[in-house]
């Protein structure tokens, strides 16, 4: 009798499957609609140059060795080769299954039923130390199945990083914790340097773009509380363009963010990850991104990173230092 061969099962986008923890999840977050929207032709300025360097291989090796999920992979980020080739990565905590289903995001959706990797804080700290990072971005899926939304897990991870790598700056791109100030405070007391929570889109488009449990005002309130509670911590948010918003709505969102004391803003082009996700309404030109950056700076943002391929954590270390060279062209 011949030897049995393990054949990997390929899960199609929009289909249900079981994770290694036994969680039922939907691949890429959105159920298959059976429809294929007509896509706008991609403009030449959105061409992505792949970088392959020893640093890229080193980051990939460390991520796999310590069983870390990265938003670079899970969210199909267009900048993965560039960032990894520069020895940086955005680490995604608390697994790769999100309890929410935002219609722009390709992270898998399901209910982890309270599962957490207890070794993740120390594994993450070890990886950051081995990479010798000056700056690290931590993000996560939403974990509405946890009483604190994962705030204590974030805090443990940040403290572990600071203990092993005290000079490393830590940015936390977090869920909204359902607006709980208590949970946000737990994270802010961990020694984090930058607190980020993404508003994602303009107020009018919040409901069709984000999960119903998210809210425009809820995000603004979380960011305002963070600044009030810890004035020394920089606050940050991100806005995707090309979902049907107007330039006037973008500027109004800037005003709302400044009213709520947000320090840093990133602006980037929305890219449709699969045919089941929201279609692209328009491609915003590099010139418009550059103009919006100047408008934002005049409104008093500490920094505005603005460009077609900019994502919330893209070159975050340079944005933190106000070294935004090349991000607005």
Swiss-Prot record:
[4Fe-4S] cluster 2 binds at residues 98, 102, 105. [4Fe-4S] cluster 1 binds at residues 72, 77, 83, 313. Pfam families: Radical_SAM. Binds 2 [4Fe-4S] clusters per subunit. One cluster is coordinated with 3 cysteines and an exchangeable S-adenosyl-L-methionine. It catalyses: [[Fe-S] cluster scaffold protein carrying a second [4Fe-4S](2+) cluster] + N(6)-octanoyl-L-lysyl-[protein] + 2 oxidized [2Fe-2S]-[ferredoxin] + 2 S-adenosyl-L-methionine + 4 H(+) = [[Fe-S] cluster scaffold protein] + N(6)-[(R)-dihydrolipoyl]-L-lysyl-[protein] + 4 Fe(3+) + 2 hydrogen sulfide + 2 5'-deoxyadenosine + 2 L-methionine + 2 reduced [2Fe-2S]-[ferredoxin]. PROSITE patterns: RADICAL_SAM. Residues 83-303 form the Radical SAM core domain. One of its GO terms (cellular component) is cytoplasm. It comes from Legionella pneumophila subsp. pneumophila (strain Philadelphia 1 / ATCC 33152 / DSM 7513). The lineage of its organism: Bacteria, Pseudomonadati, Pseudomonadota, Gammaproteobacteria, Legionellales. Its cofactor is [4Fe-4S] cluster. Its EC number is 2.8.1.8. Disulfide bonds: none annotated. This is Lipoyl synthase. GO terms for molecular function: 4 iron, 4 sulfur cluster binding; lipoate synthase activity; metal ion binding. SUPFAM superfamilies: Radical SAM enzymes. It comes from the Bacteria. Its main location: cytoplasm. Keywords: 4Fe-4S, Cytoplasm, Iron, Iron-sulfur, Metal-binding, S-adenosyl-L-methionine, Transferase. It is found in: Cytoplasm. Belongs to the radical SAM superfamily. Lipoyl synthase family.
């Amino acid at each position: 009798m011949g030897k049995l061969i393990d054949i990997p099962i390929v899960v199609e986008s929009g289909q249900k499957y079981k994770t290694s923890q036994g969680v039922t999840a939907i691949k890429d977050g959105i159920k298959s609609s059976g429809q294929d929207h007509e896509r706008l032709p991609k403009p030449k300025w959105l061409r992505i140059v792949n970088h392959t360097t020893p640093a890229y291989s080193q980051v990939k090796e460390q991520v796999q060795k310590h069983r870390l999920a990265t938003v670079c992979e899970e969210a199909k980020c267009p900048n993965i080769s560039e960032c990894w080739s520069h020895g940086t990565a955005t680490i995604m905590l608390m697994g790769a299954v999100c309890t929410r289903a935002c219609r722009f995001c390709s992270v898998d959706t399901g209910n982890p039923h309270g599962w957490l990797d207890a070794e993740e804080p120390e594994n993450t700290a070890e990886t950051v130390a081995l990479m010798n990072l000056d700056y690290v971005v931590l993000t996560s899926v939403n974990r509405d199945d946890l009483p604190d939304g994962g705030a204590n897990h974030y805090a443990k991870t940040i403290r572990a990083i600071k203990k092993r790598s005290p000079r490393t700056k830590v940015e936390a791109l977090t869920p909204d914790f359902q607006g709980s100030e208590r949970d946000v405070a737990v994270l802010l007391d961990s020694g984090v340097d930058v607190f980020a929570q993404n508003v994602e889109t303009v107020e009018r488009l919040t409901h069709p773009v984000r999960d119903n449990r998210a809210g425009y005002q809820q995000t603004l309130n979380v960011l305002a509380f963070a600044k009030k509670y810890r004035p020394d911590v920089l606050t940050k948010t991100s806005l995707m363009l090309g979902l049907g918003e107007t330039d006037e709505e973008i500027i109004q969102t800037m005003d709302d963010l400044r009213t709520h004391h947000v320090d840093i803003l990133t602006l980037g082009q929305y890219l449709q990850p699969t045919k089941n996700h929201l279609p692209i309404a328009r491609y915003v030109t590099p010139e418009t991104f550059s103009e919006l950056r100047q408008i934002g700076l005049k409104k008093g943002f500490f920094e505005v990173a603005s460009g077609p391929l900019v994502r919330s954590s893209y070159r975050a270390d340079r944005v933190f230092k106000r070294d935004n060279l090349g991000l607005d062209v």
